[in-house]
Protein backbone atom coordinates (compact mmCIF):
# COMPACT_ATOMS: atom_id res chain seq x y z
CA UNK A 1 0.00 0.00 0.00
CA UNK A 2 1.11 3.59 -0.70
CA UNK A 3 -0.01 6.74 1.14
CA UNK A 4 -0.39 10.40 0.25
CA UNK A 5 -1.48 13.32 2.48
CA UNK A 6 -3.68 16.19 1.33
CA UNK A 7 -5.96 18.85 2.80
CA UNK A 8 -8.37 18.18 -0.10
CA UNK A 9 -11.32 15.79 0.27
CA UNK A 10 -12.86 13.44 -2.29
CA UNK A 11 -9.80 12.89 -4.46
CA UNK A 12 -10.32 9.88 -6.72
CA UNK A 13 -7.08 10.18 -8.67
CA UNK A 14 -3.86 11.75 -7.37
CA UNK A 15 -2.60 14.00 -10.14
CA UNK A 16 1.00 15.12 -10.62
CA UNK A 17 1.64 18.66 -9.36
CA UNK A 18 4.66 20.91 -9.80
CA UNK A 19 7.07 19.81 -7.13
CA UNK A 20 10.31 20.60 -5.35
CA UNK A 21 11.95 18.67 -8.18
CA UNK A 22 10.76 21.22 -10.76
CA UNK A 23 8.45 18.84 -12.61
CA UNK A 24 4.92 17.55 -11.97
CA UNK A 25 5.03 14.53 -9.65
CA UNK A 26 2.91 12.61 -7.16
CA UNK A 27 4.71 11.80 -3.91
CA UNK A 28 3.70 8.77 -1.85
CA UNK A 29 5.07 6.78 1.06
CA UNK A 30 5.02 3.07 1.74
CA UNK A 31 4.35 3.97 5.40
CA UNK A 32 1.16 5.72 6.49
CA UNK A 33 2.90 7.34 9.45
CA UNK A 34 5.43 9.00 7.15
CA UNK A 35 2.62 10.69 5.20
CA UNK A 36 1.29 12.36 8.37
CA UNK A 37 4.03 15.01 8.34
CA UNK A 38 2.73 16.31 5.01
CA UNK A 39 -0.69 17.24 6.41
CA UNK A 40 0.65 20.68 7.35
CA UNK A 41 3.21 23.09 5.96
CA UNK A 42 4.65 25.20 8.80
CA UNK A 43 5.43 28.14 6.50
CA UNK A 44 1.95 28.26 4.99
CA UNK A 45 0.26 27.81 8.38
CA UNK A 46 2.29 30.58 10.03
CA UNK A 47 1.72 33.03 7.17
CA UNK A 48 -2.03 32.39 7.16
CA UNK A 49 -2.27 32.72 10.96
CA UNK A 50 -0.35 36.00 10.94
CA UNK A 51 -2.22 37.46 7.95
CA UNK A 52 0.81 37.51 5.66
CA UNK A 53 -0.72 37.53 2.18
CA UNK A 54 0.67 35.39 -0.58
CA UNK A 55 -0.23 34.11 -4.03
CA UNK A 56 1.51 31.17 -5.65
CA UNK A 57 3.24 28.06 -4.34
CA UNK A 58 4.39 27.90 -0.73
CA UNK A 59 7.95 27.29 0.41
CA UNK A 60 8.16 23.82 1.94
CA UNK A 61 9.43 23.28 5.46
CA UNK A 62 10.42 19.84 6.67
CA UNK A 63 12.35 19.27 9.88
CA UNK A 64 12.60 15.52 9.69
CA UNK A 65 15.09 12.86 8.85
CA UNK A 66 15.37 9.13 9.34
CA UNK A 67 16.91 7.16 12.18
CA UNK A 68 17.13 3.37 12.30
CA UNK A 69 14.56 3.08 9.51
CA UNK A 70 12.00 5.37 11.11
CA UNK A 71 10.99 8.92 10.31
CA UNK A 72 12.26 11.26 13.04
CA UNK A 73 10.72 14.69 13.49
CA UNK A 74 13.07 17.25 15.02
CA UNK A 75 11.76 20.38 16.70
CA UNK A 76 13.92 23.23 15.43
CA UNK A 77 12.23 25.63 17.86
CA UNK A 78 10.24 25.05 21.10
CA UNK A 79 6.86 23.36 20.55
CA UNK A 80 7.36 23.30 16.78
CA UNK A 81 5.42 20.07 16.26
CA UNK A 82 2.42 21.31 18.24
CA UNK A 83 2.68 24.66 16.48
CA UNK A 84 2.75 23.08 13.02
CA UNK A 85 0.23 20.27 13.38
CA UNK A 86 -2.21 20.97 16.25
CA UNK A 87 -5.72 21.52 14.94
CA UNK A 88 -4.79 20.73 11.34
CA UNK A 89 -7.09 18.23 9.67
CA UNK A 90 -6.63 16.48 6.38
CA UNK A 91 -6.80 13.21 4.51
CA UNK A 92 -4.50 10.27 3.99
CA UNK A 93 -5.16 8.65 0.62
CA UNK A 94 -4.23 5.03 -0.04
CA UNK A 95 -3.23 3.56 -3.38
CA UNK A 96 -2.53 -0.06 -4.18
CA UNK A 97 -0.41 0.62 -7.25
CA UNK A 98 1.72 3.53 -8.42
CA UNK A 99 1.92 3.57 -12.24
CA UNK A 100 5.45 4.50 -13.31
CA UNK A 101 6.52 4.66 -9.67
CA UNK A 102 10.19 5.07 -8.78
CA UNK A 103 11.92 5.01 -5.41
CA UNK A 104 12.78 8.51 -4.26
CA UNK A 105 16.48 8.27 -3.56
CA UNK A 106 16.74 10.88 -0.80
CA UNK A 107 13.71 9.80 1.27
CA UNK A 108 13.36 6.20 2.54
CA UNK A 109 10.09 4.43 1.69
CA UNK A 110 9.05 7.25 -0.66
CA UNK A 111 7.87 6.71 -4.21
CA UNK A 112 7.37 9.30 -6.95
CA UNK A 113 5.60 9.16 -10.28
CA UNK A 114 4.79 11.53 -13.09
CA UNK A 115 1.60 9.59 -13.81
CA UNK A 116 -1.85 9.86 -12.18
CA UNK A 117 -2.41 7.42 -9.30
CA UNK A 118 -5.86 5.86 -8.71
CA UNK A 119 -7.04 6.17 -5.08
CA UNK A 120 -8.18 3.02 -3.30
CA UNK A 121 -9.25 4.58 0.01
CA UNK A 122 -9.32 7.73 2.09
CA UNK A 123 -8.87 8.29 5.83
CA UNK A 124 -9.92 11.54 7.51
CA UNK A 125 -7.39 12.76 10.09
CA UNK A 126 -9.14 15.24 12.43
CA UNK A 127 -5.94 16.44 14.14
CA UNK A 128 -2.53 15.83 12.60
CA UNK A 129 -0.76 16.52 15.91
CA UNK A 130 -2.75 13.83 17.73
CA UNK A 131 -2.15 11.37 14.88
CA UNK A 132 1.60 12.03 15.00
CA UNK A 133 1.67 11.49 18.79
CA UNK A 134 -0.27 8.23 18.35
CA UNK A 135 2.25 7.06 15.76
CA UNK A 136 5.09 7.98 18.13
CA UNK A 137 3.46 6.09 21.00
CA UNK A 138 3.03 3.04 18.74
CA UNK A 139 6.75 3.18 17.92
CA UNK A 140 6.14 3.96 14.25
CA UNK A 141 8.02 7.28 14.20
CA UNK A 142 10.33 9.24 16.48
CA UNK A 143 10.17 12.78 17.84
CA UNK A 144 13.13 14.75 19.18
CA UNK A 145 11.75 17.68 21.13
CA UNK A 146 13.64 20.96 21.10
CA UNK A 147 14.78 20.55 24.71
CA UNK A 148 16.33 17.15 23.86
CA UNK A 149 18.47 18.35 20.95
CA UNK A 150 22.23 18.05 21.42
CA UNK A 151 24.38 21.19 21.32
CA UNK A 152 25.81 20.20 17.93
CA UNK A 153 22.30 20.06 16.46
CA UNK A 154 21.40 23.46 17.94
CA UNK A 155 24.55 24.94 16.41
CA UNK A 156 23.64 23.37 13.05
CA UNK A 157 20.11 24.85 13.28
CA UNK A 158 21.59 28.30 14.00
CA UNK A 159 23.91 28.09 11.01
CA UNK A 160 21.28 26.59 8.70
CA UNK A 161 18.61 29.16 9.54
CA UNK A 162 21.04 32.01 8.82
CA UNK A 163 21.92 30.43 5.48
CA UNK A 164 18.26 29.72 4.62
CA UNK A 165 17.35 33.33 5.43
CA UNK A 166 20.15 34.70 3.24
CA UNK A 167 19.13 32.45 0.34
CA UNK A 168 15.42 33.34 0.67
CA UNK A 169 15.80 36.97 -0.41
CA UNK A 170 13.13 36.48 -3.11
CA UNK A 171 10.80 34.35 -0.96
CA UNK A 172 9.05 36.78 1.42
CA UNK A 173 6.78 34.12 2.96
CA UNK A 174 9.75 32.01 3.98
CA UNK A 175 11.59 35.01 5.41
CA UNK A 176 8.45 35.98 7.34
CA UNK A 177 8.29 32.46 8.80
CA UNK A 178 12.00 32.39 9.70
CA UNK A 179 11.79 35.83 11.38
CA UNK A 180 8.74 34.74 13.37
CA UNK A 181 10.05 31.37 14.51
CA UNK A 182 13.76 32.15 14.91
CA UNK A 183 13.89 35.80 16.04
CA UNK A 184 17.11 35.39 18.05
CA UNK A 185 18.92 33.78 15.12
CA UNK A 186 17.60 36.23 12.51
CA UNK A 187 18.16 39.36 14.63
CA UNK A 188 20.61 41.67 12.91
CA UNK A 189 20.61 39.85 9.56
CA UNK A 190 18.64 42.59 7.77
Positions of predicted regions on the chain:
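Short, conserved phosphate/pyrophosphate- and ester-handling motifs at nucleotide-, phospho-/glycolipid
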Residues: 31
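ADP-ribose/NAD+-binding catalytic cleft of ART/PARP-like enzymes
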Residues: 1-23, 38-41
Amino acid sequence: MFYHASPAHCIEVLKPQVSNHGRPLVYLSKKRENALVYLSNAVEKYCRETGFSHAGPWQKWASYGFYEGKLRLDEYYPNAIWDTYKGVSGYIYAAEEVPGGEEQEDIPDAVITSQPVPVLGCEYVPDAYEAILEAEEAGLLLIRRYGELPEAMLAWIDSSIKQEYAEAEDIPTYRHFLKGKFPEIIAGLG
